[in-house]
Amino acid sequence: MDKALVSPIEDAFARYSTLTVEEIEDSIRPTVNRVIDGLETGAFRVAEPDNHGGWKVNEWLKKAVLLYFRVHDTMIVDAQPAPFWDKIESRFSGYDAAKFRAAGVRVVPGAIARRGSYFGKDVVLMPSFTNIGAYVGEGTMIDTWATVGSCAQLGAHCHLSGGAAIGGVLEPLQASPAIIEDHCFIGARSEIVEGVIVGHHSVISMGVFISQSTRIYNRATGEISYGYVPPYSVVVSGQLPAKDGTHSLYCAVIVKQVDEKTRAKTSINELLRGFAD
C-alpha cells in the first residue's frame, strides 16, 4: 500500500461533492490517475489474499475508482464502427503490435475493456465487457458476452463462459467485489454477485445464480451456507422446499467436492454429469 496515495484519496473522497475545480486540476486528478495506472499494472488490487486463507478489501482503491468519475469529464472515445461518449478510456487505447505482444493478452474484435482493469499474461478476451478496477489473472478466458464487473476479482487459469457475469461494486455500491479464485470454471449465463467468493478449483454449472442471500446447499452434509463456495466444489442450480411445504425456492447445490488429483484428471463435462443420481 502506497501511503502517499492513500491519504489524498481518503481526503478527496470525504469531500466528493464539494471538490473545487482548482484542486481537481492541481492534485486530485493526477493522484487518481496514478492509482488507476497501478490497478492496470497489477501493483494495486481492490481485493487481495490476506495470507490466512481469506481476502482483504482495499477500500481506498474503491474510493479512487469512484473518484475517477468525479474528476474526469465525459469525452469522445474513439472506436469502430462508431465513437463512444464516456468518462473512461478504452483499456487498450493507443496500443500497437509491440504493446499487445508485451502485454501478452489476446483481444478479439468486439471485446471491451475499460481503463483501470488488469489482465495477466495469456488472458483471452472474446467479445465481452471488463469494467474499471477489475483483475483478471493469467491464463484466464473471458468468453463471448461475459461480463467482469467493476473491481471484480477473477483468478488465474479460470474460464468465464458465454454470457456469464461476475458482479462489481459500483452500481449498486457493494462492500466487496465478487471473487473467483484460481482454476475455476463458471458456466454459461451464470452470475456470481454481491461479494460472493468462489473457492479455487470450483466448477459452477450453467445457469447458476449466487448472491449473498442465495442459499448454498451442500448435498453431502445437509448444511446451508451463504456467500461462499468452498474450494473444489461442483455447483448446480436447484430448489429447496419452503417451511410450510407450499412451494420451493431457488438455491445453489454443491453436488460434490473433488480433490485436486481428481480435478486434474477429469474434464469439466464429466464433473457435471450424474449430479441428479
Curated annotation (Swiss-Prot):
Location of this chain's protein in the cell: Cytoplasm
Reaction catalysed by this enzyme: (S)-2,3,4,5-tetrahydrodipicolinate + succinyl-CoA + H2O = (S)-2-succinylamino-6-oxoheptanedioate + CoA
Gene Ontology molecular-function annotations: 2,3,4,5-tetrahydropyridine-2,6-dicarboxylate N-succinyltransferase activity; nucleotidyltransferase activity
Listed InterPro entries: DapD_Trfase_Hexpep_rpt_fam, Hexapep, THP_succinylTrfase_dom1, THP_succinylTrfase_N_sf, Trimer_LpxA-like_sf
Entry annotated with the keyword Lipoprotein: no
EC class: transferase
GO CC terms in record: cytoplasm
Keyword annotations from UniProtKB, A to Z: Acyltransferase, Amino-acid biosynthesis, Cytoplasm, Diaminopimelate biosynthesis, Lysine biosynthesis, Repeat, Transferase
SUPFAM superfamilies: Trimeric LpxA-like enzymes
UniProt entry tagged with the keyword Cytoplasm: yes
Pathway terms, separated by semicolons: Amino-acid biosynthesis; L-lysine biosynthesis via DAP pathway; LL-2,6-diaminopimelate from (S)-tetrahydrodipicolinate (succinylase route): step 1/3
EC number: 2.3.1.117
A Pfam match: THDPS_N_2
Residues that, per the record, bind substrate: 106, 143
GO terms of biological process kind: diaminopimelate biosynthetic process; lysine biosynthetic process via diaminopimelate
Family label: Belongs to the transferase hexapeptide repeat family.
Subunit structure: Homotrimer.
Protein name: 2,3,4,5-tetrahydropyridine-2,6-dicarboxylate N-succinyltransferase
Protein species of origin: Xylella fastidiosa (strain 9a5c)
Gene: dapD
